């Protein structure tokens, strides 16, 4: 069994440092209005802007959004094509404003399946915002959590085969350094909209000790009020990371008296 020392307890605050969100419900939102699914995705893009605004206002340092999973390539081709066009137009339209507001944009996932113009826009957005530090916005696109772990494991195996690494050197910390978002704190709060209560292959390694919060609200209707409900719930939780409540209290006392 891993000792508590393997999982250092991060400082706990009312506002999470890193929020990860599965943005679910765009299609159902459109269907309830008897509109094409792409209309729901467009409405969902506006919810992304509201969420970024909220995070900037509250001082959240990292926001990771699940935009398109590796499994989503199996959706109807017309919907995939519409999503790719929406993604491309959103980058053209929004990156300048994100740059002005100090937001750093990153993408995680297998971008090789995207068309060259979209890959170029993604790389350009990363370059133009790389120096920004108010908020790190990571967009998971063509991403899968299992794929992420497998890619990290393969990289470690290649290092062992090349003699750069010994098998006994591989531990949780080393694997953590090879998965996506390795340079960011692990997500403190995970939010999923749309009513489903699962994490759907999103950040499987990174969410090990994350607080989970689910809402029936469909993503296009997600706003500051719902986001504040999530933060209020988060602020009332005790994050123990495998320790006891007494140990957490002792650590808090040590920190405050240091």
UniProtKB/Swiss-Prot annotation:
- Name the UniProt key words of this record, in alphabetical order: Cell shape, Cell wall biogenesis/degradation, Magnesium, Metal-binding, Peptidoglycan synthesis, Transferase
- Which InterPro entries does the entry link to? UPP_synth-like, UPP_synth-like_CS, UPP_synth-like_sf
Q: Where, if anywhere, are coiled coils annotated?
A: none
Q: Which organism is it from?
A: Xanthomonas oryzae pv. oryzae (strain KACC10331 / KXO85)
Main enzyme class: transferase
Residues bound to substrate = 25-29, 37, 41, 69-71, 73, 75, 192, 198-200
Entry's family note: Belongs to the UPP synthase family.
Its name, as the record gives it, is Ditrans,polycis-undecaprenyl-diphosphate synthase ((2E,6E)-farnesyl-diphosphate specific)
Q: Name one GO molecular function term.
A: ditrans,polycis-undecaprenyl-diphosphate synthase [(2E,6E)-farnesyl-diphosphate specific] activity
Protein's gene: uppS
Q: Which cofactor does it need?
A: Mg(2+)
Query: In the record, what lineage is assigned to the organism producing the protein?
Result: Bacteria, Pseudomonadati, Pseudomonadota, Gammaproteobacteria, Lysobacterales
| Residue numbers binding Mg(2+) | 24, 211
| Reactions this protein catalyses | 8 isopentenyl diphosphate + (2E,6E)-farnesyl diphosphate = di-trans,octa-cis-undecaprenyl diphosphate + 8 diphosphate
Can the keyword Metal-binding be found in this entry's annotation? yes
| Entry keyword Membrane | no
Tell me the subunit arrangement: Homodimer.
Q: Which residues form the active site?
A: 24, 72 (proton acceptor)
A GO cellular component term found in this entry reads: cytosol
Please describe what this protein does: Catalyzes the sequential condensation of isopentenyl diphosphate (IPP) with (2E,6E)-farnesyl diphosphate (E,E-FPP) to yield (2Z,6Z,10Z,14Z,18Z,22Z,26Z,30Z,34E,38E)-undecaprenyl diphosphate (di-trans,octa-cis-UPP). UPP is the precursor of glycosyl carrier lipid in the biosynthesis of bacterial cell wall polysaccharide components such as peptidoglycan and lipopolysaccharide.
How the cofactor is bound: the record states:
Binds 2 magnesium ions per subunit.
Query: EC number(s) of the enzyme?
Result: 2.5.1.31
GO BP terms: namely: cell wall organization; peptidoglycan biosynthetic process; polyprenol biosynthetic process; regulation of cell shape
């Amino acid at each position: 069994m891993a000792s508590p020392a393997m999982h250092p307890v991060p400082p706990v605050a009312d506002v999470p440092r890193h929020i990860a969100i599965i943005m679910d419900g765009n299609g159902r939102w459109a269907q309830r209005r008897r509109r094409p699914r792409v209309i729901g995705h467009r409405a969902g893009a506006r919810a992304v802007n509201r969420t970024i605004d909220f995070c900037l206002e509250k001082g959240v340092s990292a926001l990771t959004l699940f935009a398109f999973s590796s499994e989503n390539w199996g959706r109807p081709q017309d919907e995939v094509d519409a999503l790719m066009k929406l993604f491309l137009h959103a980058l053209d339209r929004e990156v300048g404003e994100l740059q002005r507001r100090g937001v750093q944009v990153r993408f995680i996932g297998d971008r090789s399946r995207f068309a060259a113009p979209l890959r170029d826009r993604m790389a350009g957005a990363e370059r133009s915002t790389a120096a920004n530090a108010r908020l790190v916005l990571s967009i998971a696109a063509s991403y899968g959590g299992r794929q992420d772990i497998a890619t990290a494991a393969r990289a470690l195996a290649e290092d062992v085969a090349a003699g750069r690494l010994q098998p006994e050197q591989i531990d949780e910390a080393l694997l953590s350094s090879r998965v996506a978002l390795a340079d960011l704190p692990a997500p403190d709060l995970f939010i999923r909209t749309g009513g489903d209560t699962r994490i759907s292959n999103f950040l499987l390694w990174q969410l090990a000790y994350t607080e989970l919060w689910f809402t029936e609200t469909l993503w296009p209707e997600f706003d500051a009020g719902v986001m504040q409900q999530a933060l209020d719930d988060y602020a009332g939780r005790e994050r123990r990371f495998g320790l006891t409540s007494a140990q957490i209290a002792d650590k808090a006392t040590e920190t405050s008296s240091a």
